Amino acid sequence: MATMPASEYEEPFVTVEEYLRTSYRPDCDYVDGEIRERNVGKYEHARVQALLAAWFNQHEKAWEAQVVTEQRVQVSPTRVRIPDVTLLSLGSQPDVILDPPLLVIEILSPDDTYSDTQERTQDYRAMGVETVWIVDPKTRTGRMCSGAEWVEASRLEVKGTPLYVDLPGIFSQMTSA
């Protein structure tokens, strides 16, 4: 019985430089030479993302933080993640974020797995991101990680800053016209 060489089964290795020169639609994560598709395109995910971005945008000057969505963040020399929502200090930013953001928010999609979500948040924390939030549109809940523990809360905050969001207010807009 003939077998195919192992190289024909493996995903092609992509250098970080090649990844950063390439545009993907939708954009993909880059993990140790592998291009990983993200779960996007579902209504509830997109709606929560838009509502969170609008919330932070209206507080930009007062909170001295700017919001971006689906922005490449290089979390290590061999990994680039695309958070759903990212809060950065005011001012110009590079095309690929290299410094730890003030806040990273991941919005769960129905196809997201626990292990993938954990790996993503560990990457952000290893980069130096002090606070990561996970928002679940299906259960209308949120968790925040600041330090080593995850805490479920309806009001998500970034310790030592004015940054916060009341999730019931966000979720109440999910059905409004």
Predicted regions and their residues:
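Gly/Pro/Ser/Thr-rich low-complexity, intrinsically disordered segments predominantly at protein N-termini
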Residues: 1-177
